[in-house]
């Protein structure tokens, strides 16, 4: 937990949930260098917690957030400035981020922070953008941002922005972070990365033997990730999410997952979370339909 001090009257907390890639197939490469893919995204009930405090000027300030990330590169700040620009407004905000998701873990933490910022500020600032417009803005920040705005577990194609809702099982997961940094750019440029997986249809999921095409490369480049996969595989089939470094496995009950979670070896961190087919952000927005007037104090 963060020691971040949230001021009285700040709006929140608003969740920025983690996601898992239940499988990840790379099906090609576009002329601009981006890979085309097929995947299924599912959310977790484990999230960063964001608070927003409106300002009387147009400044955007960040408090907390991912350690070591400069303010100008923080996706919350970039999302807020992008919304300012798109809506042509002169409103400001202080953003407080109680960061719980690891940076660069393959859980989409930065993208989720950006999506929650766009979603909440669209309401707080009264900009009135439609969901499709927010998704277009989100895609400019990262390929994973649209699914967090979409708010449903989804079959994804393109670079991850073409989304169709799906309803996979919602098991309990053990998620392990082997505490190494995996460079997505390095994985995606690795000459041994599979880039021609056969295309599936949505009806092939979940009966197909899906896998993560990045896993072999990440295993080779990062022995700690390979060790985490091997350790978790002893209890339940384990997979990499995104390009890692986090790995996960599904369990039928919370008790089973917690029993494994308590045995995570020293030097790694882990948590137990429930898979969700609807984003906690959207669930909260539905409960708050009367207006975004929730204050933390």
Protein language model features and the residues they cover:
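Glycine/serine-rich anion-binding loops at beta->alpha junctions
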Residues: 96-125, 143, 237-251
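ATP-dependent small-molecule kinase catalytic core of the GHMP/sugar-kinase superfamily
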Residues: 2-15, 21-36, 127-237, 250-297
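Residue-level signal for inorganic ion chemistry
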Residues: 22, 50-52, 76, 110, ...
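ATP-binding N-lobe of GHMP and related small-molecule kinases
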Residues: 2-104, 123-132, 159, 177-179
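A broadly conserved amphipathic alpha-helix scaffold signal in soluble, globular proteins
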Residues: 81, 116-122, 136-139, 146
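Conserved hydrophobic residues forming the short capping helix/wall of the S-adenosyl-L-methionine
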Residues: 80-84, 122, 236, 261-264
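Short, basic/glycine-rich phosphate-binding loops at helix/coil junctions
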Residues: 56-69, 117, 139, 204-212
């Amino acid at each position: 937990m963060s020691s971040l001090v949230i001021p009285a009257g700040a709006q929140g907390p608003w969740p920025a949930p983690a996601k898992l890639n239940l499988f990840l197939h790379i099906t090609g490469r576009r002329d601009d260098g981006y890979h085309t893919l097929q995947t299924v995204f599912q959310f977790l009930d484990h999230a960063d917690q964001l608070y927003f405090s409106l300002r009387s000027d147009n400044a955007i300030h960040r408090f907390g957030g991912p350690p070591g990330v400069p303010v100008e590169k923080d996706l919350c700040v970039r999302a807020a400035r992008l919304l300012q620009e798109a809506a042509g407004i002169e409103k400001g905000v202080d953003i407080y981020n109680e960061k719980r998701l690891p940076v660069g873990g393959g859980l989409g933490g930065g993208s989720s922070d950006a999506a929650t910022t766009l979603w909440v500020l669209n309401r707080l600032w009264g900009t009135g953008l439609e969901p499709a417009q927010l998704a277009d803005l989100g895609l400019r920040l990262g390929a994973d941002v649209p699914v967090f705005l979409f708010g449903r577990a989804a079959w994804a194609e393109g670079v991850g922005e073409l989304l169709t809702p799906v309803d996979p099982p919602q098991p309990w997961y053990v998620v392990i972070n082997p505490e190494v940094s995996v460079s997505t750019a390095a994985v995606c440029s690795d000459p041994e990365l599979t880039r021609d997986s056969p295309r599936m249809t949505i009806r092939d999921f979940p009966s197909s033997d899906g896998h993560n095409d990045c896993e072999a490369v990440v295993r080779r480049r990062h022995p700690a990730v390979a060790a985490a996969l091997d350790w978790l595989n002893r209890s339940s089939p384990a997979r990499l999410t995104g390009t890692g470094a986090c790995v996960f496995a599904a369990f039928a009950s919370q008790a089973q997952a917690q029993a494994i979670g308590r045995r995570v070896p020293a030097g790694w961190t882990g948590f137990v979370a429930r898979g969700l087919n609807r984003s906690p952000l959207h669930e909260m927005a539905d409960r708050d339909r009367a207006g975004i007037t929730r204050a933390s104090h």
